[in-house]
C-alpha cells in the first residue's frame, strides 16, 4: 500500500500554492508515495476577497478535518499573519478536536512551509508557533535542517525558507517564488515523503 503524504495549505494570493505544487512534485518523486494537494476552507466572504484583490482559488480539493486521518505524513503550508499562521489555517486546525480526542494523528510526521511579506516578517516565528499544533496532536515535526545543502547558504540573492522548512517572500505581492525557493520546496517534499515512507515501515509500497 502506498504511503500517503498530504500537502495541506492555505493560499490567498498564490505564493504558498506555488510552493505547495513543487512540494507535491518532490514528494511524488519518491517511489511508493502518493502525494496529494489539499486546500483548507476559506473563511472570508467572496465580497471581502474581491476587495482584497485576491485571485480565484485553484481546483485543488477542500479538505475536511477527518480526512487527515487517512494520511501517513503531512506538509502544512500557510502565509504569515503578524508572525503566526493565517487564521484560515488555524480555524481548520481548531476543528480537529475529534482527531485529537482519538489520537489519530499521533506519531505521524509533519513538516511546515510558509510565505511572508518581507525578510524578518515572521518566517521562523510562524514555524515555531505552528509546532505547538503538532505537539498537541502528538505528531512528529520534521524540519529540513540543512539537508538542502549549499542552497541554504545563499547570500547573493533574497531567499525565503529556513531549517524549519521551505519559504518565500511575497513583497507587495508581485514577487514570486524563485527557482532556488522552488528547489528547496521540491527538496522538502522529497525529504519528508521519504521519512514518512520509512516510518510507515514494511507495509509501505
Curated annotation (Swiss-Prot):
SUPFAM superfamilies (alphabetical): Flavoproteins
| InterPro entries the record matches | Flavodoxin/NO_synth, Flavoprotein-like_sf, Flavoprotein_WrbA-like, FMN_Rdtase-like_dom
The UniProt keywords, alphabetically, are: Cell membrane, Flavoprotein, FMN, Membrane, NAD, NADP, Nucleotide-binding, Oxidoreductase
Q: Locate the residues binding NAD(+).
A: 13
List required co-factors. FMN
Query: Which reactions fall under this protein's catalytic activity?
Result: a quinone + NADH + H(+) = a quinol + NAD(+); a quinone + NADPH + H(+) = a quinol + NADP(+)
In what residue span(s) does the Flavodoxin-like domain sit?
5-192
GO molecular function ontology, one term from the record:
NADPH dehydrogenase (quinone) activity
> What are the record's GO terms for cellular component?
cytosol; plasma membrane; plasmodesma
According to its UniProt record, the EC number is 1.6.5.2
Its subcellular locations are: Cell membrane
Q: Which domain of life is it from?
A: Eukaryota
Annotated residues that bind FMN are located at 11-15, 112-165
Pfam families listed in its UniProt record = FMN_red
Cofactor-binding details, from the entry:
Binds 1 FMN per monomer.
Its biological purpose is as follows: Catalyzes the transfer of electrons from NADH and NADPH to reduce quinone to the hydroquinone state.
Family, similarity comment: Belongs to the WrbA family.
**Protein's UniProt name:** Probable NAD(P)H dehydrogenase (quinone) FQR1-like 1
Amino acid at each position: 500500500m502506498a504511503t500517503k503524504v498530504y500537502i495541506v495549505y492555505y493560499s490567498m494570493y498564490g505564493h504558498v500554492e506555488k510552493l505547495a505544487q513543487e512540494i507535491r512534485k518532490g514528494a511524488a518523486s519518491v517511489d511508493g508515495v502518493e502525494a496529494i494537494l489539499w486546500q483548507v476552507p476559506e473563511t472570508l466572504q467572496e465580497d471581502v476577497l474581491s476587495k482584497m484583490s485576491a485571485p480565484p482559488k485553484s481546483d485543488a480539493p477542500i479538505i475536511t478535518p477527518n480526512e487527515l486521518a487517512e494520511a501517513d505524513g503531512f506538509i502544512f503550508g500557510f502565509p504569515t499573519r503578524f508572525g503566526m499562521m493565517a487564521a484560515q489555517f488555524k480555524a481548520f486546525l481548531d476543528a480537529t478536536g475529534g482527531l485529537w480526542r482519538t489520537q489519530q494523528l499521533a506519531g505521524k510526521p509533519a513538516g511546515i512551509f510558509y510565505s511572508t511579506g518581507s525578510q524578518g516578517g515572521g518566517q521562523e516565528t510562524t514555524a515555531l508557533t505552528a509546532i505547538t499544533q503538532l505537539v498537541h496532536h502528538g505528531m512528529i515535526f520534521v524540519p529540513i535542517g540543512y539537508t538542502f545543502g549549499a542552497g541554504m547558504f545563499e547570500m547573493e540573492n533574497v531567499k525565503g525558507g529556513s531549517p524549519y522548512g521551505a519559504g518565500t517572500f511575497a513583497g507587495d505581492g508581485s514577487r514570486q517564488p524563485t527557482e532556488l525557493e522552488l528547489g528547496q520546496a521540491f527538496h522538502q517534499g522529497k525529504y519528508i515523503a521519504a521519512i514518512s515512507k520509512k516510518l510507515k515501515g514494511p507495509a509501505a509500497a
